[in-house]
């Protein structure tokens, strides 16, 4: 049965702000305390979703989460009414408030790791929500992420859902941002590449010195076991610790793959030749096409500032692919020159599409961060909750919803405004009704 890649983009939440919470993420640290525009952020994401839908790609939407997360503040000892909890946190621990108000769940590449049915032993699509244990503000996401995924992929015949791995650094899991699947066609059995930054239980193994490695080998292996992946369908590769120390906090900041194409920077991996040999040996029915970008063409610094590799690599047809990049790639002369040359070389990447995602980019999230890829057969796609699939009508509905509920400016001081909490809950309550998903959020389940 024919299968498709479906991209589920995160809808930016009403509290989108720049709290600078992500050490190791250069953009996040650079833009700390800037004033954000949640309305424009959401609309930028929606415009990308709609444009790709209009090009014929299958596109879905994943919901934002309840923020500020009052339940987490209560777990940290703040008491009283929701308003009192919010004001106590703002006064006593503003950094906590910034964390629980983060809209970071927009980057759905970190929501989960997904293995399609062609790869798994039970023939179902498997989802494991990422524990995101490396960052407090992201570690609180996975319970709601799991509920959202279960609500959208709600058919046990086709879909299997796993809880996040144990919330310890030894099993730090960042989801699909460190995972790429290679195959001939989406319905064919593929090879899943898991990329890790360190080996948790081997202190002598290579690891970065400046910035933390968020993903462990042990987490990758655990997810592969949960999904029932055969050893012949899995490759584990270590990300180069030196590029992590240059701000490459996820592999999708330095490499991207689709079907039988890997687009990567020459410094992306620790043992590149060994990894490519293993991938080529395990990939069935087609040849791996590795498109290497040398340091002389694009430096790691330029790759990080432009997010060249945090792009979407999409199939136009059986042979040709399109790269979806942020506008920052056109603003960087070296990257622009490289892309202009790339599409004329005769390789698999024939086209480049540029999108303005500046609101997300200032927090360190490009096109690839904003989407979770799910390969689905026709029958599986038919079993997906239909009201989250992009259409002309859904685009108009969500734009009107954003116009109704979102602010066009949020500063750090605004996060302590009890009215913002009310606005967020009102918006999300209406959203679950619009998308016909029932109760998903803590305030709805209380």
Curated annotation (Swiss-Prot):
Family listed: Belongs to the succinylarginine dihydrolase family.
InterPro entries reported for this sequence: AstB_sf (IPR037031), SuccinylArg_d-Hdrlase_AstB (IPR007079)
Record-linked Gene3D superfamilies: Succinylarginine dihydrolase (3.75.10.20)
SUPFAM superfamilies: Pentein
Residues engaged in binding substrate: 19-28, 110, 137-138, 214, 252, 363
Superkingdom assignment: Bacteria
Keyword Hydrolase attributed: yes
Primary gene name: astB
Designated name of the protein: N-succinylarginine dihydrolase
Listed EC numbers: 3.5.3.23
Catalysed reactions listed for this entry: N(2)-succinyl-L-arginine + 2 H2O + 2 H(+) = N(2)-succinyl-L-ornithine + 2 NH4(+) + CO2
Pathway stated in the Swiss-Prot or TrEMBL entry: Amino-acid degradation; L-arginine degradation via AST pathway; L-glutamate and succinate from L-arginine: step 2/5
Source organism (scientific name): Hahella chejuensis (strain KCTC 2396)
UniProt subunit comment: Homodimer.
Task of the protein: Catalyzes the hydrolysis of N(2)-succinylarginine into N(2)-succinylornithine, ammonia and CO(2).
Enzyme class: hydrolase
Key words, A-Z: Arginine metabolism, Hydrolase
GO BP terms, alphabetized: arginine catabolic process to glutamate; arginine catabolic process to succinate
Active-site annotation: 174, 250, 369 (nucleophile)
GO terms for MF: N-succinylarginine dihydrolase activity
């Amino acid at each position: 049965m024919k299968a498709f890649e479906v991209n589920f983009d995160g809808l930016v939440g009403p509290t989108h702000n720049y709290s600078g919470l992500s050490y190791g993420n250069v953009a996040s640290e650079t833009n700390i305390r800037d004033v954000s525009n949640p309305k424009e952020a959401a609309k930028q994401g929606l415009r990308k979703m709609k444009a790709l839908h209009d090009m014929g790609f299958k596109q879905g939407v994943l919901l934002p989460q309840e923020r500020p997360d009052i339940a987490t503040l209560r777990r940290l000892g703040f008491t009283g009414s929701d308003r009192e909890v919010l004001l106590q946190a703002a006064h006593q621990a503003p950094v906590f408030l910034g964390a629980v108000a983060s809209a970071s769940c927009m980057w759905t590449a970190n929501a989960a790791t997904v293995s399609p049915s062609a790869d798994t032993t039970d023939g179902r699509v498997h989802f494991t929500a990422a524990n995101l244990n490396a960052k407090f503000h992201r570690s609180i996401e996975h319970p709601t992420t799991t509920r959202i995924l279960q609500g959208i992929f709600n058919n046990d015949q086709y879909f299997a859902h796993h809880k996040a791995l144990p919330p310890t650094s030894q099993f730090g899991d960042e989801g699909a941002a460190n995972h790429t699947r290679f195959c001939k066609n989406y319905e064919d059995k593929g090879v899943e590449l898991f990329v890790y930054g360190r080996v948790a239980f081997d202190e002598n193994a290579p690891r970065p010195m400046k910035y933390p490695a968020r993903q462990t080998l042990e987490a990758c292996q655990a997810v592969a076991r949960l999904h029932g992946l055969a050893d012949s369908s899995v490759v584990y590769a270590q990300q180069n610790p030196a590029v992590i120390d240059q701000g490459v906090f996820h592999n999708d900041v330095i490499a991207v793959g689709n079907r039988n194409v890997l687009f990567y920077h020459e410094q992306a991996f620790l043992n590149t030749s060994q990894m490519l040999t293993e991938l080529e040996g395990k990939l069935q029915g087609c040849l791996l096409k590795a498109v290497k970008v040398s340091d002389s063409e694009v430096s790691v610094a330029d790759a990080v500032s432009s997010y060249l590799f945090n792009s979407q690599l999409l199939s136009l047809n059986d042979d040709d692919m399109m790269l979806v990049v942020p506008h920052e790639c056109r603003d960087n002369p070296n990257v622009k020159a490289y892309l202009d040359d790339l599409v004329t070389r005769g390789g698999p990447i024939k086209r480049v599409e540029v999108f303005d995602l500046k609101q997300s980019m200032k927090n360190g999230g490009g096109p690839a961060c904003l989407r979770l890829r799910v390969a689905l057969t026709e029958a599986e796609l038919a079993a997906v909750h239909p009201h989250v699939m992009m259409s002309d009508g859904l685009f108009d509905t969500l734009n009107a919803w954003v116009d109704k509920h979102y602010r066009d400016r949020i500063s750090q001081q605004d996060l302590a405004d009890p009215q913002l909490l009310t606005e967020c809950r009102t918006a999300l309550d209406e959203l679950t009704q619009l998308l016909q998903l029932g109760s998903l959020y803590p305030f709805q389940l209380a």
